[in-house]
Regions:
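Interfacial loop at the N-terminal end of multi-pass membrane proteins
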Residues: 4, 8, 26-51, 70-73
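N-terminal signal-anchor transmembrane alpha helix
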Residues: 10-24
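Alpha-helical transmembrane segments of multipass membrane proteins
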Residues: 23, 63, 96-100, 123
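Hydrophobic core of alpha-helical transmembrane segments in multi-pass integral membrane proteins
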Residues: 53-67, 118-123
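Mid-chain, well-packed structural core segment of small domains
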Residues: 64-98
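Membrane-helix boundary connector in multi-pass membrane proteins
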Residues: 94-111
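Membrane-water interface at the C-terminal end of transmembrane alpha helices
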Residues: 118-134
Length: 134
């Protein structure tokens, strides 16, 4: 298996964990101190619960783009993924900066390494050459 495919699968697995965390927040898990700058320690308000569901959907959409670009899944997205993967890289870079700068020590400890791994995987997928079909 190529590095590109492994990076894409790694991105998708990590993204599934991030999405599960967001869904748990939306469902009432008391982990608000570990998300969104720790502005809402404990349970999320109804508005933040909606935001968590939206974030989970966006994370999985980005995973789909990365998987498509690597040729792992969603072949119908292949052409669009050529440029969308760079949007995923940009979002990953911003996410890493924000997670390093957050006032929440817990969020920084947990999510900065996750953001780094997501950024690294997306850069690998975006920059590695497409291998020919076998």
């Amino acid at each position: 298996m190529s590095i590109r495919r492994m990076a894409a699968i790694g991105y998708a697995v990590i993204s599934a964990g991030v999405a599960a965390f967001q869904i748990a927040l939306a469902a009432g898990a008391p982990w608000g101190a570990y998300a969104m700058g720790g502005v809402s320690p404990g349970h999320y308000s109804p508005a933040l619960r909606v935001a968590a569901v939206v974030q989970a959907a966006l994370v999985m959409l980005m995973a789909g783009v990365v998987l498509s670009r690597a040729g792992v899944a969603l072949p119908a997205w292949s052409r669009t993924s050529r440029w969308l993967v760079w949007l995923v890289v940009a979002v990953g870079a911003v996410s890493l900066v924000l997670n390093l700068a957050t006032p929440s020590a817990g969020e920084r400890l947990v999510w900065a390494p996750v953001a780094f791994l997501l950024l690294a995987c997306s850069v690998l997928v975006a920059t590695e050459r497409q291998e020919p079909e076998e």
